[in-house]
């Protein structure tokens, strides 16, 4: 939005430059805040969707393994995959609880806070329209003041001043209200969002505490023999070599 005086405007300074600078500064801070809130909403939504996709995918993988012929001949392997499936379902359940908590305590407040900005922007537009009306009528008054003071011109000047008065009062009321309330709204952001992000942190702490238990339980149920990465790779290569020795997979 442009705050420059329109061409052919009144000679009289309608709004002091210091007041206009204060207005631009306060409104600029709120515009920046609105952009930041929108970005935060977008990023939080992506994070929630990614969290849910991750846990749902993990459950699908463990369920697929349970129904895979790989598990049929080996009881120990089947027990391990069953334990994995149980762990993934527990993880998904806790993840859903975390997401529900974040939705209620973070996303919903963000949405409610964002809903205020359209009304704020509309109030600024009404203030700008009132300012333009004020300038237009002030220019009209000044034009008549410069004319010869004939009876007809004095009557026109009087009428123009009468038209100007309520328009000026309307602008000054709108301007004063915005200058008073915009800083209050901006300064309220910390008190409004602090509880939400405290809840976000608590939800994350609870979730990862539960995940520590879930995977701790899983670790106790799997094979206690731990192989290093090098040993595991060596074992896999040996098994793969055995498979390649079979005639059905031999190169022609």
Swiss-Prot record:
Keyword list (alphabetical) reads:
Cell cycle, Cell division, Coiled coil, Cytoplasm, Cytoskeleton, Septation
Quote any Pfam family the record assigns.
BAR
One GO biological process this protein is involved in is: cell division
User: What's the protein called, per UniProt?
Assistant: Bridging integrator 3 homolog
Q: Which Gene3D superfamilies match?
A: Arfaptin homology (AH) domain/BAR domain
**Which segments of the protein form a coiled coil according to its record?**
17-57, 119-150, 224-244
Source organism per UniProt: Xenopus laevis (African clawed frog)
UniProt function note:
Involved in cytokinesis and septation where it has a role in the localization of F-actin.
According to the UniProt entry, where is the signal peptide?
Answer: none
Q: Where in the cell is it found?
A: Cytoplasm, Cytoskeleton
On the tree of life, the source organism's domain of life is Eukaryota
| Example of a GO cellular component annotation carried by this entry | cytoplasm
Q: Which GO terms describe its molecular function?
A: lipid binding
């Amino acid at each position: 939005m442009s705050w420059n005086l329109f061409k052919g405007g009144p000679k009289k300074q309608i709004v002091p430059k210091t007041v206009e600078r204060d207005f631009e500064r306060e409104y600029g801070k709120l515009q920046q805040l609105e952009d930041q809130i929108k970005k935060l909403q977008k990023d939080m939504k992506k994070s929630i969707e990614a969290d849910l996709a991750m846990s749902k995918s993990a459950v699908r993988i463990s369920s697929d393994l349970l129904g895979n012929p790989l598990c049929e001949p080996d009881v120990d392997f089947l027990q391990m995959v069953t334990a994995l499936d149980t762990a993934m379902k527990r993880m998904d359940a806790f993840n859903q609880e975390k997401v529900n908590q974040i939705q209620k305590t973070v996303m919903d407040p963000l949405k409610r806070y964002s809903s205020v900005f359209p009304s704020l922007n509309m109030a600024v537009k009404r203030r700008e329209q009132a300012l333009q009306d004020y300038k237009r009528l002030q220019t009209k008054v000044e034009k008549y003041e410069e004319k010869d003071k004939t009876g007809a011109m004095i009557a026109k000047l009087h009428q123009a001043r009468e038209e100007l008065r309520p328009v000026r009062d309307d602008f000054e009321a709108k301007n004063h209200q915005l200058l008073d309330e915009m800083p209050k709204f901006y300064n309220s952001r910390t008190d409004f969002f602090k509880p939400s992000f405290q809840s976000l942190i608590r939800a994350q702490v609870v979730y990862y505490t539960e995940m520590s238990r879930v995977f701790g339980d899983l670790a106790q149920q799997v094979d206690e023999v731990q192989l290093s990465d090098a040993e595991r790779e060596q074992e896999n290569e040996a098994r793969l070599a055995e498979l390649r020795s079979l005639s059905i997979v031999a190169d022609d």
